[in-house]
Amino acid sequence: KAGNYDPKTTIVIDPRLVFSTFTGSTQDNWGYTATPAPDGSFYAGGIAFGSGYPTSPGAFQTTFGGGVNEDNNGPFDMAIIKFSANGSNRLFATYLGGTSNEQPHSMICDAQGNLIVAGRSTSPNYPRTIPQVGIGGGYDIVVTKLSADGRTLLGSVKMGGINDDGVNIRGKYVAPDGADGTRRNYGDDARSEVILDGANNIYLASCTQSNNFPVTAGAIQSTFGGGNTGISHFPQDGVIIKFAPNLSGVLFSTYFGGSGDDACFVLSLNPVTGNLYVGGGTNSTNLPGDKFGALHDIYQGGLTEGFLTQIR
């Protein structure tokens, strides 16, 4: 965030490099997300394509869970590592996954340094602390809370409908008809964000291709909006979910989308009102919500547009 500056001058952003390091993995390893902890330590999350990730003794999962070949990639598990504030020490490292494939999308820490990881999984035995939410199928959304020392699963949920959830239109497939528009809008298929409120409730913005994704009573939008059918995917809506702090249950869950493809990418809470702001991409001309007085109250054209919505 830039401070006060003269808009007539050139801004030079020259941050100081605190540390840069390899993970030490002897297996292929690809990074997706990272977050700081309250004490200045640092978490990084990615995927590892087999045994050889440098897990630490006593970590929650020290062995590779397994997986399948997917689009000429795989198998892969989530791979989570925590570094000291100066990057000189590995505080812990762990796999996170079941017998199929997993991928992290977003991470955040609570005030105690516990780590919340949001992503997706196709494993029927993904580590969780409550039963599957929804019937599941394809990729499901997963949210997991690990203790600050990486040893204990404090809470974990797997949630989804019959088709892919948490997948923003698989990136391998570029549709000539433009049906991959929301993927292009943000650059890849691994898009969702997790945040916390002051009571440590967990909020997630993501997407679903399931017309039976689990929603809660009184949801803003209880039915699937629809979308485009592309080379590799079903129609897609955004989803917005709130979980209990220990992931013991879903406090609310709703679709958010019109008759085109929609995806929720980012979210933020107003610290004064508690209202939730959600941003994403859409090619729906009938995106839900009261647009009276909005900067643009109708779809402006093009393959995909961004959107911002406020939920009270």
Which residues fall in each region the model found?
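A sequence-level/structural motif corresponding to short, flexible coil/turn segments enriched
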Residues: 5-312
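A generic structural motif
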Residues: 1-3
